[in-house]
Amino acid sequence: MALDPNYEDFQRLSLRFAGTLGASDPFGAARAAVDFGHRYSQKRDTLPQTDEDRAFHLVARATELIDYQLPFATDASAPQTIAEARKLLSEALELDPECHDARRMLSAAQAPTPNEYHRFLVEGAQEVLESCGRRRDAVTGSDELADVARTLAMRPYLRWLAAECASSLICGRYRLTLQEGEEALAVEPEDPADVSLTLALTYAKLEDEEGLRALCERADERRGPAWYALARAALAFKREDRDEARAHIARLLALYPNAGTTLARQDDLPDGVFARLAIDPGTEDELILATSEATVLLQEGCDSHERGTFGWWVANLPEVTQAQARELAADPSLGEGQK
């Protein structure tokens, strides 16, 4: 799932390197491929690259700090991690003023409110589209490598739209979320940014069962089944069909490790800044991420328990509490930091 900056960095440099090779010597190309792998991992600076490539590499390094190290940093080390990431992103913009990933990530860190960040994304989208479009149109050739290069040229715009879509959901602009999600799917129908997962939550928020059904007919539900199950459970709960809602929660308990603990805790995690966090499918982390993004559904309509009515109902289902008890008995560390 999700867009991995390290893999994209590898793709960018491999395309640049491939452009230096002759097509008439397959054995030489094979040797060159081995040489590229070694140089990429050991001597990256010796590979042919542009300032645009160097800037994206800095973005990939900043992503590792912000999205994957900062959430686990101590209070003492967090400021240094943040400062280092901002420095990398600023350097990326110096190398490539049209490094839109860096510009977006800096804004995410600096915007005083979610609404301010949302406004930044909405106002900047057209400029990013035009910039990425120019780079796409500058790619020559009609072979497979050229097609990949054109796709990569549009990826910053795709990530911009995906961030805009997620931001609209957070800010309660649900119709705009649907519009932005469809725009992202038009850029890449294969949906590498997994905007369909955001759309599933949005349809549940709007209580639009037909919209969710239509989405599921064209989306691959094997990519992120937790999002679809939570959306369907929320819809069933809203129409007071508790049996169907419980069936969807039961599916989560069967699909994911430590699902009882995850559904009981309902931790709210920081969003990935580069893109939705890259996690392995079917893992505990996938359900944790889905539950966090489904906060808009779980915390809707706070009751006397200071928790959303749907979220409280899920956390207190007998099958959830029983599963959590079994999981804690097997691994007491799961209870650390319990709310």
What is each model feature region?
Residues 64, 75, 109, 150, ...:
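Residue-level signature for tetratricopeptide repeat
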Residues 68, 79, 113-115, 171, ...:
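Structural motif corresponding to the intra-repeat A-B loop/turn of tetratricopeptide repeats
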Residues 102, 160, 193-195, 228, ...:
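TPR alpha-solenoid repeat register
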Residues 50, 234-339:
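Long, ordered, amphipathic alpha-helical scaffolds
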Residues 1-94, 249-252, 326-339:
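Extreme N-terminal leader/anchor segments
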Residues 82, 115-118, 174-175, 209, ...:
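TPR-repeat structural position
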Residues 47, 90-95, 130, 150, ...:
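Solenoid-like repeat scaffolds
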